[in-house]
């Protein structure tokens, strides 16, 4: 009996006969030869079947029957295919299979996603099948690499995984963006972020991170928004703002390197410019303040490439502003110290400048915009209470959060990264919907 292997491992079996469980992604050929494009989730590669070889091995009657089975295979039929692995310099993969036998496992009739072009709505309605296509597999392989490296990076840097709840009993920030549900007669909300709970974890464990789904009821229909997405939040006690930025930069560079190392064929499939990714790793990220960014935007707003509206100091950036800023520097760019009025209540003011807060957004170049948001947290109880009172917030909704400042408060901060935005950036794809297996967007909750 031949050894069963995966496609990605065939390089270790050159000259040997192996069996692969796969699906037929495509088929071509005529006369005495048939070409099968095979996939098994690890990679795609080609199998070649020659009619005379089957006749010689099995005799004319059985050999012709088996070859006829191969000729009649339809798209996405599942098979056990046996053959001898050969090197193939013409192939991007570098190897092909000289097919010696085949067994059909599950037939596929009238597969809806054919090689022709299909509209986005059709593909999204058939997302459960679209996932099988070469480019969608590549994006998910990049997502997997990013998740793997996330756990590896934080473990190496002394962080403990901490699981924040998905259901919360209070409306932590903007209640207009919360999904509300009934919790045994009491209103409950799907989490927008695990950050507030993560701060409690940091006071117990020092360095913590969580990774899980979050939900935002934003009625935004853009290429950068999902209503359900995955977030990695990290929180760190006894931390300075510069140390936080250094950690964020090291993390993003580790993610990009991890994708280069773990998913090179996926990047090739997507035709991602890997030299750009290598440059982002090699060069220091740019760091500028919010006010410097506004000055820069105003200075260049009449330039030919300045496709953005005029902003004054105190205004928030839109996507065109973020795109221009990061493209101007050509590397991921931290914009620091935003106005307190447009940021969250818990952010610590810049020393000597209470109108600005110690925070930063990391803007990715090539039009991908914000991928990380982070800040130092206000650790002083009285200052935090004063800020909440100024904003008319109900303190009783935040009793546990305020307790963290009453019992051994310390300087601390953290940041969060939207995994789908990072996947989109690393993969070089245009729309965030392809960065998650089953995207949830405005007007889309199926399949």
From Swiss-Prot:
Keyword Membrane carried by entry: no
EC number: 6.1.1.22
Alphabetic keyword roster: Aminoacyl-tRNA synthetase, ATP-binding, Cytoplasm, Ligase, Nucleotide-binding, Protein biosynthesis
MF GO annotations: asparagine-tRNA ligase activity; ATP binding; catalytic activity, acting on a protein; nucleic acid binding; transferase activity
Main location group: cytoplasm
SUPFAM superfamilies per UniProt: Class II aaRS and biotin synthetases, Nucleic acid-binding proteins
GO biological process, one term: asparaginyl-tRNA aminoacylation
Record InterPro entries: Aa-tRNA-synt_II, aa-tRNA-synth_II, aa-tRNA-synth_II/BPL/LPL, Asn-tRNA-ligase, Asp/Asn-tRNA-synth_IIb, NA-bd_OB-fold, NA-bd_OB_tRNA
One GO location term (cellular component): cytoplasm
Subcellular location(s) of the protein: Cytoplasm
Broadest EC class assigned to this enzyme: ligase
Claim: Cytoplasm is one of the keywords in the record: yes
UniProt catalytic activity: tRNA(Asn) + L-asparagine + ATP = L-asparaginyl-tRNA(Asn) + AMP + diphosphate + H(+)
Coiled coil residues, start to end: none
Pfam families in alphabetical order: tRNA-synt_2, tRNA_anti-codon
UniProt subunit comment: Homodimer.
Family: Belongs to the class-II aminoacyl-tRNA synthetase family.
Designated name of the protein: Asparagine--tRNA ligase
Organism: Streptococcus pneumoniae serotype 2 (strain D39 / NCTC 7466)
Upper taxonomic lineage: Bacteria, Bacillati, Bacillota, Bacilli, Lactobacillales
Gene for this chain: asnS
């Amino acid at each position: 009996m031949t050894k069963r292997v995966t496609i990605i491992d065939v390089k270790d079996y050159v000259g040997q006969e192996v069996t692969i469980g796969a699906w037929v992604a495509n088929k071509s050929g005529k006369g005495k030869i048939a070409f099968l494009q095979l996939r098994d989730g690890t990679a795609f590669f080609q199998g070649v079947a020659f009619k005379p070889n089957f006749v010689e091995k099995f005799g004319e009657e059985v050999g012709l029957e088996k070859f006829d089975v191969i000729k009649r295979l339809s798209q996405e039929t599942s098979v056990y295919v046996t053959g001898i692995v050969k090197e193939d310099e013409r192939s991007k993969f570098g190897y092909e299979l000289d097919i010696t036998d085949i067994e059909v496992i599950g037939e596929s009739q009238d597969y809806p996603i054919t090689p022709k072009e299909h509209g986005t709505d059709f593909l999204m309605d058939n997302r459960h099948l679209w996932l099988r296509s070469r480019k969608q597999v590549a994006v998910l392989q990049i997502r997997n690499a990013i998740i793997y490296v996330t756990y590896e990076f934080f473990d190496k840097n002394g962080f403990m995984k901490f699981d924040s709840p998905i259901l919360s009993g209070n409306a932590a920030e903007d209640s207009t963006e919360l999904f509300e549900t009934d919790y045994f007669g009491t209103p409950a909300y799907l989490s927008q972020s695990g950050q507030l709970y993560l701060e409690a974890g940091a006071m117990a464990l020092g360095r913590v991170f969580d990774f899980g789904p979050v939900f935002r009821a934003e009625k935004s229909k853009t290429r950068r928004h999902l209503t359900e997405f995955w977030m990695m939040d990290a929180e760190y006690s006894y931390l300075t703002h510069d140390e936080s930025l250094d950690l964020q930069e090291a993390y993003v560079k580790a993610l990009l390197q991890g994708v280069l190392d773990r998913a090179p064929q996926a990047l090739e499939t997507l035709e991602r410019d890997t030299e750009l990714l290598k440059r982002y790793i090699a060069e220091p990220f740019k760091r500028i303040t919010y006010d410097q960014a506004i000055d820069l935007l105003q200075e260049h707003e009449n330039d030919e490439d300045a496709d953005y509206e005029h902003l004054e100091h105190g205004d928030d950036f839109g996507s065109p502003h973020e795109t221009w800023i990061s493209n101007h520097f050509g590397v991921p760019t931290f914009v620091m110290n935003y106005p307190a009025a447009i940021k969250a209540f818990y952010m610590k003011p810049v020393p000597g400048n209470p109108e600005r807060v110690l925070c930063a957004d990391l803007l990715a170049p090539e039009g991908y915009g914000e991928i990380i948001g982070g800040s130092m947290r206000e650790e002083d109880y009285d200052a935090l209470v004063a800020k909440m009172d100024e904003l008319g917030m109900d303190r009783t909704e935040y009793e546990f959060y305020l307790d963290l400042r009453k019992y051994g408060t310390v300087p601390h901060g953290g940041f969060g990264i939207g995994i789908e935005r990072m996947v989109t950036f690393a993969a070089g794809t245009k729309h965030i919907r392809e960065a998650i297996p089953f995207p949830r967007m405005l007007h889309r909750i199926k399949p």
